[in-house]
Regions:
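N-terminal nucleophile
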Residues: 1-257
Length: 257
């Protein structure tokens, strides 16, 4: 499970703003965000068990994230949702990523998942349950966890929205500052929704803040390797700016050819 908030196309200089807390078993290892070789280049963390990822950005400015969710009819030996997320990041647009998700999920070989997909052209959520549903991402703030996007029955989602909208989020700086506080909120008492989860064997294991601007130099990628109420956000923005600049150069070269 995870908690992800995306502010989409409501801040002109930063059309994609993301905050996400990842929940996983504590003994499931992962690697810090790094640039993955291949085309297109990807910046993401890697799950060492399956080799997939939970979220990332590619050099075309495509964001893809995945949140696990319940599914009634689970396959006996499910394919990795994280590997699918990584494969979606190898596509060149949000629409291509949606097509790949639909093609793979329709095989019935995956456990339940929500895929959040966005670039500057379009944004989507794929609800991968027993019935697959594609929902266009609305402009503004959307929140998703283990249910449908912007599910009014999700108490954790409602808490997240309340914390993020205590002030107007009309710039990347304001969104990231507010999100870093909200997503670092310590665990709530038992029985109440919280931003950071902590139990004996699993809980919040990392947190990510992302801003994708119109220009590569404006991109931000911050990552906390641990629950963000205890671990500090470290800056990986130079890596993100590097791959976005590479993507822009390659696009200009193709246009001249």
């Amino acid at each position: 499970m995870c908690l992800l908030a995306i502010q989409y196309r409501s801040v002109p200089e930063a059309p994609i703003l993301v905050a996400a807390n990842r929940e996983e078993a504590y003994d499931r290892g992962s690697l810090l965000p790094s640039i993955q070789a291949g085309k297109p280049r990807i910046l993401c963390g890697i799950d060492t068990k399956a080799g997939g990822t939970w979220l990332g950005v590619n050099q075309q400015g495509l964001f893809v994230g995945v949140c696990n969710r319940h599914k009634m009819l689970s396959p006996l030996v499910p394919k990795s949702r994280g590997v699918l997320c990584r494969e979606m990041l190898r596509t060149n647009s949000s629409r291509q990523a949606v097509d790949l998700a639909m093609e793979e999920l329709s095989t019935g070989k995956y456990d339940g998942a929500n895929f959040i997909i966005a670039d500057q052209e379009s944004g989507w959520v794929v609800h991968g349950t027993d019935e697959i549903e594609v929902v266009e991402l609305p402009d503004g703030l959307s929140i998703i966890s283990s249910g449908d996007v912007n599910d009014l029955r999700d108490e954790r989602g409602k808490l997240c929205r309340r914390l993020l909208t205590l002030q107007t989020l009309d710039s990347a700086v304001k969104f990231l500052a507010r999100a870093s506080q909200a997503f670092s909120r310590p665990p709530a008492p038992e029985g109440r929704p919280g931003m950071v989860n902590r139990s004996k064997e699993r809980g919040t294991v990392s947190s990510t803040l992302i801003a994708l601007g119109k220009k590569p130099r404006d991109a931000i990628f911050q990552y906390a390797s641990g629950a963000p109420d205890q671990a500090k956000y470290e800056d990986y923005s130079p890596l993100l700016r590097d791959i976005l600049s590479r993507g822009l150069r390659e696009a200009r070269t193709r246009a001249k050819a």
